[in-house]
Curated annotation (Swiss-Prot):
InterPro entries: OM_adhesin/peptidase_omptin (IPR020080), OMP_A26_sf (IPR053724), Peptidase_A26_CS (IPR020079), Peptidase_A26_omptin (IPR000036). It comes from the Bacteria. This is Plasminogen activator. It is an enzyme of class 3 (hydrolase). It holds the Pfam family Omptin. Keywords: Aspartyl protease, Cell outer membrane, Hydrolase, Membrane, Plasmid, Protease, Signal, Transmembrane, Transmembrane beta strand, Virulence. One of its GO terms (cellular component) is cell outer membrane. The keyword rRNA processing does not apply.
Amino acid sequence: MKKSSIVATIITILSGSANAASSQLIPNISPDSFTVAASTGMLSGKSHEMLYDAETGRKISQLDWKIKNVAILKGDISWDPYSFLTLNARGWTSLASGSGNMDDYDWMNENQSEWTDHSSHPATNVNHANEYDLNVKGWLLQDENYKAGITAGYQETRFSWTATGGSYSYNNGAYTGNFPKGVRVIGYNQRFSMPYIGLAGQYRINDFELNALFKFSDWVRAHDNDEHYMRDLTFREKTSGSRYYGTVINAGYYVTPNAKVFAEFTYSKYDEGKGGTQTIDKNSGDSVSIGGDAAGISNKNYTVTAGLQYRF
C-alpha cells in the first residue's frame, strides 16, 4: 500500500473517531428525550407552630395545624439530554380550599407540666398548598432493565390555613366557651425552602416500571406568619439549618410503548427548626423581636396520586 493511502486511511479513522466523540457531546433535543406526566390525588399532613421561653427553653405555646385529604394536581416534565443525565421540574398545587383542623395549647403556668389553656377549631380551612421542585439526576449505573444514580435540587413548599369558630378552655378550665361561628380566629402561613441531595433508582420488567427517590437536606429555611385576628396581633418567625427527609415511590404500567399509567406516594418531613420571633401590634404598630430559639416550625405531609406519563 502506498504511503499516501496509509495516511489517508489514518486520517479517515481519526476523523470518524473525532466526529463520534463530538456527537456524544451534543445534547439530545429530539422529542423522545422529553417526558411529561400529570396526576391528581390527595394531600394530608400536619404542621406545628411553637413558642418558647428563649432563656429557659420552656414551651409556652403550640399550635397544631392539620391538612385533611385536600385535592391536588401534580405536573412533571423531564428532559434526558444525555443517557447519563436527566433534568426535571415537578410540582403540585391544591385544586381548591380544603378541610383542616387546628388545636391551640398554652402553658401559662411554669410550675405546671400540663397545658393551662386550649382552644379547638374543627372549622379550619386549608386555603392553599403548593410545591415546586427543580432537580438534576446523574445516572451512575445503567442496564436495559435498571438505572441508579444521585440527584440534587431545590424545593419550595407552602401551606396556608384559616381557623374559624371553635371552643376554648382557659385557666385550667375556669373559663370555657365558644367563639362565634364563622368568625376568623387565627390565620397561618408556612414556607419551606431548601437545596437537597439524594438517591434515585428505576427498575423495569416487561411493561411494569418502579421508580424510587430519596431526598435529604440539612439546609432548610422556614418562614411563617401568624395572624391573631381577634387580638390584632401578628407573629412572624424565621428558622434555618433544620433537616428534611423525603421519599417518592412511583409504580406504573406501560399501556403503549410511550404511555404509562402510574400511582405515586410521596412523604416529606421537615424537622423542627428554631429561631427568633417578631410580634407586631396592628393597632399601635409597635413591634417586639426576640432572638435565640424563641420559636419553632415543623411539618410532615404525604400525597397519594394517580395519573398518566407520556414520552414523546
